[in-house]
A protein has these predicted regions:
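Hydrophobic, aromatic-enriched alpha-helical segments typical of multi-pass transmembrane helices
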Residues: 1-178
Length: 178
């Protein structure tokens, strides 16, 4: 049990990415099929939050010296903010769009700064996902209304690029890293 909690960054980030991809696929399929997960959705949200934090915290070591130290330290800060915003929104209907607007900029930055670390297709997916996050969460934050509807096909594109850019890209980069 101790080994699970005290593992190296690479292994922890890989496990977080697998969980992130799995939870997002479950949500994506459930959304398309209009499934109601009930209270299990709270469990999925918890796993999603922890997996996303694991991915974000691992980016510091994955990117290494390709980004400045203040950027690397910023990953811990955004991971904490995303975790708090995500978990606060589990049982309460809170407006967390401000935090996720900022997170959209972080995803965009990940795509732009990870050249040579994450393969281009996954970097571009992160850039697209970041732009979607900025537009969707930003419009909700500024106007109170998201310009991308919840049941819009364009939201599926944003979600798939989010899974690819934030989940698959770093996972494959970690798999290649010695």
């Amino acid at each position: 049990m101790k080994k699970f909690f005290i593992q190296d960054v690479k292994e922890g980030s890989q496990q977080a990415a697998y969980m992130f991809i799995a939870v997002n696929v479950v949500w994506l399929v459930g959304g398309i099929a209009e499934l109601d997960y009930g209270n299990f959705d709270n469990v999925l949200q918890l796993f999603w939050s922890f997996s996303l934090v694991g991915i974000i915290l691992g980016l510091k070591d994955l990117q290494g010296d390709t980004v400045p130290e203040d950027w690397r330290q910023g990953y811990a800060m955004i991971a904490a903010a995303v975790l708090v915003a995500s978990l606060l929104g589990v049982n309460e209907d809170l407006n967390t769009s401000g935090v996720f607007t900022f997170f959209g900029f972080v995803i965009l930055g990940l795509g732009v700064t990870s050249e040579g670390v994450i393969d281009n297709i996954w970097r571009y997916a992160a850039i697209i996902a970041g732009l979607f996050g900025i537009v969707a969460a930003g419009s909700q934050f500024i106007t109170g209304t998201s310009i991308i509807a919840d049941d819009s096909p364009i939201q599926i594109v944003g979600w798939v690029t989010f899974i690819a850019g934030v989940g698959i890209g770093p996972l494959l980069a970690w798999n290649k890293k010695e």
